[in-house]
Amino acid sequence: LNELKKLQKNNNFNLIAIHINHNVQKDSKKWKTFCEDTCKKYEIKFITHSLRRTKNKTSNLEKKLRDKRYRFFEKTLEKNSILFMGHHLDDVIETFFLSALRGSGIEGLSSIPKERALGKGKLVRPFLNISKSEILMRAKKE
């Protein structure tokens, strides 16, 4: 958020944070509060959306939640909006190995796209070449 605030200051655009509560983890309300407080600190508009709790604990739970999350993003994004996601290098590695274990072919092993169209806007993942530990280290310095 700190880097986006710097960009906003120099480029004059609206910055909005979107928090999705999946209602899966026991600390999900605490995470929402943390995100909301952080956005207040940075003076960033905060939108939160709570997904309906899924009763069946199928192996597809993660996919179902992802699909619901992206449908919300598609509805929420305005024309020419950019949605920045926090996916990082560790996610790329995890996705590759999970796909390989499932027996995906060459196309199924392709990397997470750095950007793609989403609804009326665009989804961008600026941290795909940075590890989670490096992101956390940078955040602690801020």
Q: Where are these predicted regions, by residue range?
A:
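Core alpha/beta nucleotide-donor-binding catalytic domains of modification enzymes
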Residues: 1-142
